[in-house]
Curated annotation (Swiss-Prot):
Protein name: tRNA N6-adenosine threonylcarbamoyltransferase
Keyword Acyltransferase applies: yes
Gene (UniProt): tsaD
Membrane-spanning parts: none
Annotated Pfam families: TsaD
Chain residues that bind substrate: 139-143, 172, 185, 283
Source species: Colwellia psychrerythraea (strain 34H / ATCC BAA-681) (Vibrio psychroerythus)
Length: 349
């Protein structure tokens, strides 16, 4: 079966076609295109929802045409249309939902609304080395940080989540404090590479108590306090190094916090396989630390290739195909669901 996937939940327009006849591997991705709105939002220091929606309107249909041409296919060669229905920015979601549902109707194909975080969770299934069920998943991005027990597709148990800022959001806000341009998360990670480890110490939030929830708001505040305290009356070279040292301390605090919680989750659920997905899962320091953590537990860690860590159409196409094979076909009264609980999804039978 072949399915078109449409992703428009935030500030990236992702379109892909996936064919399960080629297996759960990179070869199943017949074509994919991704358009990022970084240039649109850079002057504002963050995503402007109205501008995001308008840009999705401008780019979605042209990208669909390009992906069909890349795969040398026509709509008659497809078996369904999948689109992100939530969570995300409601205006951005409505663009993808309306286009996806309309195309499915016009092409006389099933329409499959997809949960954005289920797409991220299943993204490692697009690799050659795929995890077996059950496993613990760490979903970590700009909008979400959560730990989930996964027994099968659609069988999800929420173990813990952020009670305030997501990890990716904390990265971006701290990067702004350090004078880095939007999007700041990757830039902060790059800056941290030249920082002196151990010069500054920041807290590991909520690791001193039981439970698997996260909190990054206080860590962001602590980093801001450190910037204001340590970055006064410095030469340009000293300021640059101090910023790098603070970036290193911040990143290590986030990585340690995530690793501690992942270890707890694996031990609590008596599992050995860990999946990490979402934009922050591309962070090299996080991958290295979680590899060490799982190895000590006799387990292993799985993650998507970097290009599929961020929002993309391939993960939506793959997740949508699993739902399509289970009989999902949305009626014409579709809706966007900006606050859609992952553990409310029905299992795939």
């Amino acid at each position: 079966m072949r399915i078109l996937g449409i992703e428009t939940s935030c500030d990236e327009t992702g379109i892909a076609i996936y064919d399960d006849g080629l297996g759960d591997s990179p070869e199943g991705i017949l074509a994919h295109r991704l358009y990022s709105q970084i240039a649109v939002h850079a002057d504002y220091g963050g995503v402007v929802p109205e501008l995001a929606s308008r840009d999705h309107v401008r780019k979605t249909i042209p990208l669909i045409k390009e992906v069909l041409a890349d795969a040398n296919l026509t709509p008659k060669d497809l078996d369904g249309v999948a689109y992100t229905a939530g969570p995300g920015l409601v205006g951005a979601l409505l663009v993808g939902c309306s286009i996806g549902r309309s195309l499915a109707y016009g092409w006389e194909l099933p329409a499959v609304p997809v949960h954005h975080m289920e797409g991220h969770l299943l993204a490692p299934m697009l690799e050659d080395d795929v995890p077996e069920f059950p496993f613990v998943a760490l979903l970590v991005s700009g909008g979400h940080t959560m730990l989930v027990r996964v027994d099968a597709i659609g069988e999800y148990k929420l173990l813990g989540e952020s009670v305030d800022d997501a990890a990716g959001e904390a990265f971006d806000k701290t990067a702004k404090l350090l004078g880095l341009d939007y999007p700041g998360g990757p830039a902060l990670s790059k800056m941290a590479e030249s920082g002196e480890a151990g010069r500054f110490k920041l807290p590991r939030p909520m690791t001193d108590r039981p439970g698997l929830d996260f909190s990054f708001s206080g860590l962001k505040t602590a980093a801001g306090t450190l910037v204001r305290k340590e970055c006064l009356n410095l030469s340009d070279s000293d300021l640059k190094q101090t910023h790098a040292d603070i970036a290193n301390a911040f990143q290590q605090a986030v990585v340690d916090t995530l690793a501690i919680k992942c270890k707890r989750a694996l031990q609590q659920e008596k599992l050995s396989r860990l999946v990490i997905a979402g934009g922050v899962s591309a962070n090299t320091a996080l991958r290295e630390q979680l590899a060490i953590t799982t190895k000590k537990l006799g387990g292993s860690v799985f993650y998507p290739r970097p290009e599929f860590c961020t929002d993309n159409g391939a993960m939506i196409a793959y997740a949508g195909l699993q739902r399509l094979k289970a009989g999902t076909d949305a009626d014409l009264t579709f809706k966007a669901n900006p606050r859609w609980a992952l553990d409310s999804l029905p299992p795939v039978k």
